[in-house]
């Protein structure tokens, strides 16, 4: 997995990026008016389609909570990123971490929320909380909208794992007859990825978020069989075994048990800094009686100490 901005990826052809060996690339969508220079380059639709056709799955990130965004604007940008069809997707809330220029600006404009300004909980600086006032949302409303977008994305595009497998499968089909040795070997690697992921398709055919997504999973499995051969007994058994495991994961998620592990904090005492001046002072303070005399034995190396000859 690698990271590439739109500006950076636009400097290479899709084949060149595929030849580099990337299976997944994380690239930012952020927002249509975020004005980040890293977003300048080829059109997103062209970039996404060309990379996916080479078997490069894309992880896209979107930010909500920019000052220009109201609910209508966020939903418009959400539809845009959904139409791009990223294999993996994240949406984070715009936040101002202490020490950043945005944090300074929010403090100066008196927009930082009191509970974070007076006693900040740094565990919330993770993209899932808003720390300053917004012209269109309260902190609670934006957090609820974030959850809504994650659910909508799942319902529209389906499980991320299957979306990744679909891209790898298309990469295999498009590159398997390439005269480029790097790309044809890439196709074989994509084929291995796809075959190894067959068991993961079974739960999606039964537990997918809706009928359309379950049909997508069945279609993908059918196409893989047609293109790469029948499913072995081992693959079938593994696939059937994943169904109850997926059911257990769904149940624990619904009940909110056995989810994120609790924070384990371990503190180690700081190592004292080396102080050469103190060491020198200690040496100078040694009593002359501890210095070995001529004819005695050195207590450090056990060698004889002789008198200097003039």
Please report, for each region that a protein language model flagged, where it lies by residue.
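Short, hinge-like loop/turn segments at secondary-structure boundaries
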Residues: 44, 77-79, 107-110
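Flexible glycine/acidic-rich beta-alpha junction loops that bind and position SAM and/or redox cofactors
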Residues: 64-72, 85-139, 162-177
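Alpha-helical packing segments of well-folded alpha/beta enzyme cores
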Residues: 13, 47, 77, 145-149, ...
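Long, contiguous hydrophobic alpha-helical segments, chiefly transmembrane helices and signal peptides
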Residues: 2-4, 61, 93-94, 132, ...
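Conserved, mostly hydrophobic/aromatic
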Residues: 17, 81, 99, 149
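Conserved SAM/AdoMet-binding glycine-rich loop
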Residues: 1-66, 74, 88
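A generic "structured core" feature
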Residues: 78-81, 89
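Radical SAM enzyme core and accessory elements
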Residues: 120-123, 127-310
């Amino acid at each position: 997995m690698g990271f590439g901005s739109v500006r950076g990826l636009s400097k290479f052809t899709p084949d060149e990026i595929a030849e580099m060996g990337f299976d997944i690339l994380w690239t930012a969508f952020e927002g249509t008016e975020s004005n980040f220079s890293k977003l300048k380059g080829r059109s997103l639709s062209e970039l996404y389609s060309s990379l996916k056709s080479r078997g490069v799955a894309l992880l896209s990130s979107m930010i909500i909570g920019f000052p220009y965004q109201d609910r209508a604007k966020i939903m418009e940008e959400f539809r845009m990123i959904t139409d791009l069809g990223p294999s993996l997707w994240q949406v984070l809330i715009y936040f101002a971490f202490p020490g950043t220029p945005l944090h300074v600006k929010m403090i100066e404009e008196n927009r930082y929320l009191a509970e974070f300004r007076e006693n900040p909980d740094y565990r919330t600086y993770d993209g899932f909380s808003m720390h300053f006032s917004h012209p269109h949302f309260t902190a609670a409303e934006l957090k609820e909208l974030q959850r809504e977008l994650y659910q909508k994305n799942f319902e529209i595009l389906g499980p991320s794992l299957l979306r990744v497998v679909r891209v790898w499968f298309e990469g295999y089909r498009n590159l398997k007859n390439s005269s480029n040795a790097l790309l044809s070997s890439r196709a074989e690697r994509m084929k291995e990825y796809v075959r190894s992921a067959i068991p993961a398709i079974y739960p999606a055919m039964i537990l997918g978020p809706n009928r359309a997504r379950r049909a997508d999973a069945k279609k993908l499995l059918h196409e893989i069989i047609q293109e790469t051969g029948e499913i072995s007994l081992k693959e079938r058994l593994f696939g059937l075994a994943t169904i109850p495991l997926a059911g257990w994961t769904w149940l624990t998620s619904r009940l909110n048990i056995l989810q994120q592990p609790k924070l384990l904090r371990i503190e180690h005492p700081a190592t004292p800094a080396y102080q050469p001046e103190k060491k020198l002072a200690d040496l100078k303070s040694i009593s002359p009686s501890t210095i070995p005399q001529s004819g005695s034995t050195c207590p450090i190396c056990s060698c004889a100490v002789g008198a200097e000859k003039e």
